[in-house]
Amino acid sequence: MKVAVLGAAGGIGQALALLLKLQLPAGSELSLYDIAPVTPGVAADVSHIPTAVKVQGFAGEDPTPALQGADVVLISAGVARKPGMDRSDLFNINAGIVRNLIEKVAQVCPKACVGIITNPVNTTVAIAAEVLKKAGVYDKRKLFGVTTLDIIRSETFVSELKNLEPARTTVPVIGGHSGVTILPLLSQVQYAEWNDAEIAPLTKRIQNAGTEVVEAKAGGGSATLSMAQAAARFALSLVKGLNGENVVECTYVEGDGKYARFFAQPVRLGKEGVEEILPLGSLSAFEQHALDAMLETLRADIELGEKFVNQ
C-alpha cells in the first residue's frame, strides 16, 4: 500500500507524515511531496523512526514521482487561515493549488483514493471532482473530503462535557466542513443525556473550533496537529477498507444528491473506496432544522468549485 502526502512540508503535512510513519501497516510506502526544497529532508527525518514503513521525499514543481503507484493520495497543500479570514477567503489561493495537483493525480494515479484536506473542503472537493471528470477518470467512490477534524473535536468536547471516556465516544458529524454546514448529531451519542440549553452552544463551539485555534495561535497559523491526527485517522481507515476490512467513517462524498451533490455522512469503506453510503439515522428537531438551514450555504460552496473548473 502506497500513501502519498501532497503538501508534506507544511504544518499539517509534517505531522501527518510522522503519524503515518508510526501507524501505517508494515510494508507500506509513504511518499512525501511539497514544492518546498526541505521536503526530502522531512522524509529523511521521519525515515529514522524504526517502523517497517519506507519513506521517500520529493520537492519541486512536479509531484509526478511522488504519485507513481499511489493507492491513497492525501492533499494538504495550500495556505493556512489567519485571524480575520474565514475558510472561503482561502478559496482564492487554494483552489488553483488543488486543481493543479488533481490534474497530476488524473494523469499519474487515476485509480487512487484521494482525500482532500485543503480548505475550503466544501469547495475544493467539487474542484477535484470536476478536474477528474474532465480527464475522464472520475470515480465518485474514490474522492473524499476529510471532515474527520469535526468528528475528533466533537468527541473531545462531548466527552469533556459529559465526563465520558474519549476513546469510546463516537459522534457522527454530517453536512460539510465549515461554519453552519458542520452538524454534529449529538442526539445519537451513546450514554449522553442532553438538555436543550446544552445543544446549541456545544454545536456552535464545534462549528467555530477552527476559529478558536486560529485566534489562540495569534497569527501563527491554524489547526495543524489536530488536523494531522484527524487526517491520519481517516487515511488509516481508508487503508483498512482497501485491505478488505469493514470500516465506517463520516466523510464528505458524492452520494445520491438528496441533500447536496457532496455531503458528509457515515460511509462504509472497502476495496473500491466507498462501498456503501449509510443512512443518517434519526435526527432531533434541532438537528433537522439545522440540516435544512445549512443546505443553501453548502450547495453554494459546491457550485463555486464547479464553476471554478468549468468557467
UniProtKB/Swiss-Prot annotation:
Its EC number is 1.1.1.37. The keyword Nucleotide-binding does not apply. Keywords: NAD, Oxidoreductase, Tricarboxylic acid cycle. InterPro entries: L-lactate/malate_DH, Lactate/malate_DH_C, Lactate/malate_DH_N, Lactate_DH/Glyco_Ohase_4_C, Malate_DH_AS, Malate_DH_type1, Malate_DH_type1_bac, NAD(P)-bd_dom_sf. It is an enzyme of class 1 (oxidoreductase). The active site is at H177 (proton acceptor). Gene3D superfamilies: Lactate dehydrogenase/glycoside hydrolase, family 4, C-terminal (3.90.110.10), NAD(P)-binding Rossmann-like Domain (3.40.50.720). NAD(+) binds at G7, A8, A9, G10, G11, I12, G13, D34, N94, I117, T118, N119, M227. It holds the Pfam family Ldh_1_C. SUPFAM superfamilies: LDH C-terminal domain-like, NAD(P)-binding Rossmann-fold domains. GO terms for biological process: malate metabolic process; tricarboxylic acid cycle. It comes from the Bacteria. Substrate binds at R81, R87, N119, R153. This is Malate dehydrogenase. It comes from Pasteurella multocida (strain Pm70). The gene is mdh.
